[in-house]
Regions:
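Acidic helix N-cap motif at the loop->helix transition within catalytic regions
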Residues: 17-20, 41-49, 91-92
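Catalytic-site signature of metal-activated, phosphate-bearing donor transferases
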Residues: 65-71, 89-255, 261
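Short aromatic/hydrophobic "clamp" motif used to bind/position activated sugar donors
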Residues: 79
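A conserved acidic beta->alpha catalytic loop
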Residues: 25, 36-45, 49, 60, ...
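Conserved donor nucleotide-binding strand/loop of the catalytic core
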Residues: 44-75
């Protein structure tokens, strides 16, 4: 695949602790499209140091709307969709060069390694995500606190990894998780139980999910082998599920605050 046919697309909001490391792995790109949600830290200053970057300002409403606005700004056949803390490995970049997508392939999934303070963990709960896709066959839709990419066509699987390496302070993570879990709770409450996945059915039980995720991360995913970093990650995931449980309990006691809309 000719790398000039790929445009990286990134969403940003106060991502100064992460941006440089992400952009340094995108120097091969002829153009990088960034949709910024009115950052107030050094994000825009960092972006200005990279001549390939073209930044568009858009007030954030939903993840899907933000991503779809970004799709409209891309003029190449392929889009590489990245969060500001997603760092491409050299192996994945080399893999792009040798891709020869058949016409029925509309996108490719990539696997992730979650990093704690810069070190990749052996096992995490991050699922593969479709990050490389044809612009003409793709659109985003909202799904809970995040978004889903709908692609018209078949998908392939990349061998290389992306490192999810967020260096923003814990206070920012806590703020984001609370916002996410408010939205996630509304999604769980508004979706009929029969339509929920097994994981979401467990989450809807409130008290069970936090302990399930702790055991899953430490034992089944091998977090204990990562030492204190593995424990840190497992506690993060447990805390996020505890937040969700608290919001679900609050909804039971005060349902008027969780009406659809």
């Amino acid at each position: 695949m000719d790398l000039s046919t790929i445009t990286p697309l990134i969403l940003t909001y106060n991502e100064a602790p992460n941006l440089d490391r992400t952009l340094q792995q995108l120097t091969w790109a002829h153009r990088i499209v960034v949709i910024d949600s009115q950052s107030t830290d050094e994000t825009l200053e960092i972006l200005s140091r990279y001549p390939q970057v073209e930044t568009f300002q858009r007030r954030f409403d939903t993840h899907a709307q933000q991503w779809n606005y970004g799709l409209e700004q891309v003029n190449t056949e392929w889009i590489l969709s990245l969060d500001a803390d997603y760092i491409l490995t050299n192996a994945l970049i080399n893999e792009f060069k040798y891709l020869s997508p058949p016409v029925d392939i509309a996108g490719y999934f990539a696997r992730y390694r979650y990093c704690i303070f810069g070190k990749p963990l052996r096992g995490t709960i991050l699922p593969p995500r479709q990050v490389l896709f044809r612009k003409s066959r793709s659109i985003y839709i909202d799904d809970g606190h995040t978004q889903l990419l709908q692609v018209n066509g078949n998908s392939g699987q990349l061998k290389g990894y992306i490192h999810h390496d967020d260096r923003k302070p814990l206070s920012r993570w806590l703020w984001a998780q609370n916002r996410y879990m408010v939205i996630e709770a509304k999604k769980l409450l508004q979706t009929p139980t029969a339509q929920l996945s097994l994981g979401d059915k467990i989450r809807k039980q409130k008290l069970l999910a936090p302990f399930v995720i702790l055991i899953y991360c430490l034992i089944l995913k091998g977090g204990l082998l990562d030492g204190w970093r593995g424990l840190y990650y497992a506690l993060q995931r447990m805390f996020a599920e505890l937040l969700l449980s608290l919001h679900l309990i609050e909804a039971d006691q005060n349902p008027t605050n969780h009406r659809p809309g």
